[in-house]
Amino acid sequence: MSCQQNQQQCQPPPKCPIPKYPPKCPSKCASSCPPPISSCCGSSSGGCGCCSSEGGGCCLSHHRHHRSHCHRPKSSNCYGSGSGQQSGGSGCCSGGGCC
């Protein structure tokens, strides 16, 4: 068998397929959490801080003009451990940010 025939038989290994939709949530919360972002619980983004019950998630207000009104983490608006996979959060940081 000639060298040219050997080169035709050799093919590069197949590449791993890239997932079309990457996972929304990280597997676990990072040790250093970022500050509140637009989709989180900062008062400037319509949120109202952290919930004090049911896992300590972040509350988001339905009413942008009434930001002091806080919803407890039984709705999908809360970035807590119970709704983290649905809403993109996995917990609340001590400084008010979401993980």
UniProtKB/Swiss-Prot annotation:
Keyword Phosphoprotein: no
Sequence similarity: Belongs to the LCE family.
Chain positions covered by the region annotation Disordered: 78-99
One Gene Ontology biological process: keratinization
Other observations noted: Belongs to the LCE cluster present on 1q21.
Name this protein carries in UniProt: Late cornified envelope protein 4A
Signal peptide boundaries: none
Keyword terms of this UniProt record: Keratinization
MF terms in GO: identical protein binding
Tissues/organs with expression: Skin-specific. Expression was readily detected in adult trunk skin, adult arm skin, fetal skin, penal skin, vulva, esophagus and tongue. Not expressed in the cervix, rectum, lung, colon, or placenta.
InterPro entries: LCE
Gly residues biased stretches: 81-99
Functional description taken from the UniProt entry: Precursors of the cornified envelope of the stratum corneum.
Subunit relationships: Interacts with CYSRT1; the interaction is direct.
